[in-house]
Each structure stands twice: as C-alpha cells, then as structure tokens.
Amino acid sequence: MSEKINVDKDIKLAETLPAKFYKDKNIFESSKKKIFLKCWHWIGDNSSCKEGNIKIPVDILPKFLNEPVIISNSDKNKIKCFSNVCTHRGNILVHEKCKSKKIICNYHG
C-alpha cells in the first residue's frame, strides 16, 4: 500500500484509513501476519486440562490463521502452549486430546 496512513497519538491529528485498507486482499493477508499472529488469543480455560500430562491440539482461528498449537498440562500442573508442528518436517504432532508425558513426532519417533 503506497498511501500513507497517519496514526497519531493525538486523536485530533489521526485520519480515517483509506477504503483500500478494508478491501485489498494483499493488505488483509499482510495484516493477518503483522497483527493477528503477534497478539494473544483466547483458546480455552484451564478446566479442559485439569489432569496431569494431558495434550490438547487447538487450531487458532481456523480458516483464518490456521495456527496449530498444543495445550499441555505437565505432571506438575503447569499449563503450557507449544506449536503443534514439527519444525523439521512440518508434521502435525498431536491429532487428538491424549494423555502423554512426551510429545513425539510420528515421523521422527
């Protein structure tokens, strides 16, 4: 987008975004990466993983971001979130909710 967007802390100096910002597919795709991938997303409360060693696959904003993650509750009752993709082969690691101490790639073993 070549048009300059004036974002000013003083609302009196700010301007309305150009119509192209709301209609251009390239701007939308760029916004998904620049805005939505860098912010927090609510994916559930801790009641779904009360048991220890539980692994729950979640897709963040399906059909929009399609970011696969794993919610994991360790045996020490510590809830964490990890990418659900093997960084080497791009393989999905956890396909359904399960109880396991380890996350194991089906490709690597």
Tell me the role of every PLM-derived stretch.
Residues 1-96:
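N-terminal pre-ligand scaffold of iron-sulfur
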Residues 86, 105-108:
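Short cysteine clusters
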Residues 96-102:
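Short cysteine/histidine-rich zinc-coordinating motifs and their immediately flanking basic loops
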